[in-house]
């Protein structure tokens, strides 16, 4: 299943095949999120904390980087938990996916 699948093709797959596709999409999304997180932390914290590039980090720069990364991760986790809770609430109120692909909850 290396080719692109449209919604109609996905609907024709067996439940096991649908689960494989969904699992693959979830894994790719998780990987992309992790890569974005690392990139964002690196860019934001480096720009904020390292004022003068050199061969080593000053003590204050190390502390700043640690605090920056900690705050960034706390914020990321809070947003992720809030979004996950909202998604679960919307799915529960709409009765789940409701009949197939492309009919998930709206985030408006």
Swiss-Prot record:
GO terms for biological process: protein insertion into mitochondrial inner membrane. It holds the Pfam family zf-Tim10_DDP. Residues 89-108 are annotated as: Disordered. InterPro entries: Tim10-like, Tim10-like_dom_sf. It is found in: Mitochondrion inner membrane. One of its GO terms (molecular function) is metal ion binding. A motif (Twin CX3C motif) lies at residues 45-68. Mitochondrial intermembrane chaperone that participates in the import and insertion of some multi-pass transmembrane proteins into the mitochondrial inner membrane. Also required for the transfer of beta-barrel precursors from the TOM complex to the sorting and assembly machinery (SAM complex) of the outer membrane. Acts as a chaperone-like protein that protects the hydrophobic precursors from aggregation and guide them through the mitochondrial intermembrane space. This is Mitochondrial import inner membrane translocase subunit tim-13. The gene is tin-13.
